[in-house]
Design a protein with these regions (language model features):
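Conserved S-adenosyl-L-methionine
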Residues: 141-262, 267-269, 274, 281, ...
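Short, hydrophobic/amphipathic alpha-helical patches that form generic packing surfaces
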Residues: 2-14, 230
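Long recognition/docking surfaces used for binding and targeting
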Residues: 8, 15-135
Length: 296
């Protein structure tokens, strides 16, 4: 969550029309001031709040994400100036807070390099997915299984996901399935209408806002999933925080999924089989599903 939040705070603040409102946070903005409103961690969280608000992300979603990102500012001691770690000694003059040191390392070693490349958000998203893979491993220790990207892409391909698909994942995790599906849907739209054309951009907007549905119970995983989508230029994806089996019925009847991508949590009863039955029941007639089933 530290890296996720810091990456978001570095992004330029833009509105729903992609008009820049203010610059993203930079290392020199973190001054190690100890007053409560100016602490480095508080500055980072406040910048995240500005970013989410400018993108017109629903308030309830903002609050859920900010509750997770508040870990960055929770410990005031991490905002006190301290001796520099050797990894940032050449990047900072004098002492700096732990939060600033982490921020500075990410800024110089990741953000600036990616920001200089074309397709900034897509590359940032790929890097973020790689970070999640190494940070969370296979997720078994916390009862969460994160599906490798090559598997999510293979399963989306098997289902022949295209620009008109309505794709659902009831155990979203870090949104790996939805990301793979979204990429295929966007590619299909660009092949049909031409890259960067008005028709393609209009269709891509519909794909991102109307054709992807994810549900995730774990608050931190929900935040990671939402951040994953945002870093790909999608702040309006329909990822819901909640219990799959207790979400309103109209969520599924209104969405009308015709593709189900699912890796149910193995720690759930019957190795997650209720997720499979529930997901198949909520699909449109003639829909297709690709599901990973636990082997024990």
């Amino acid at each position: 969550l530290y890296v996720s939040g810091m990456l978001l705070s570095m992004q330029p603040v833009v509105d729903i029309h992609n008009t820049k409102i203010q610059d993203g946070l930079m290392p020199e903005d973190l001054k190690g001031i100890q007053t409560e409103s100016k602490r480095d961690g508080v500055q980072i969280v406040n910048q995240i709040k500005e970013f989410l608000n400018a993108r017109d992300i629903p308030l309830d979603k903002q609050n859920l994400m900010l509750a997770s990102f508040s870990e960055i500012s929770k410990d005031a001691q991490r905002d006190e100036k301290t001796q520099l770690d050797k990894e940032v000694a050449k990047l900072i003059d004098g002492e700096a807070s732990t939060n600033k040191q982490i921020f500075t390392f990410i800024y110089h070693n990741i953000f600036l390099s990616i920001d200089a490349m074309a397709g900034h958000l897509d590359i940032m998203g790929e890097m973020y997915s790689e970070f999640l893979k190494y940070a969370l491993g296979d997720g078994k220790e916390i009862g969460i299984v994160l599906t490798p990207p090559y598997i999510t892409k293979m399963m989306a391909t098997i289902l022949d996901v295209n620009q008109d698909s309505k794709v659902m994942d009831l155990a979203t995790g870090s949104a790996g399935f939805l990301i793979s599906a979204m990429e295929m849907m966007i590619q299909d739209a660009e092949n049909t209408f031409g890259k960067k054309t008005t028709s393609a951009e209009d269709k891509i907007h519909i794909i991102k806002t109307k054709q992807l549905l994810g549900v995730e119970l774990n608050a931190e995983m929900y935040t990671l999933a939402a951040t994953n989508m945002i870093l790909r230029g999608d702040g309006s994806s329909n990822i819901q925080k909640g219990n799959t089996f207790r979400t309103p019925e109209e969520l599924y009847t209104h969405f009308k999924a015709d593709k189900l991508l699912l890796n149910p949590p193995f720690s759930y009863e019957e190795n997650g089989m209720p997720f499979i039955a529930f997901g198949l029941d909520k699909m449109e007639k003639g829909g297709l599903a690709a599901i990973i089933i636990q082997d024990s």
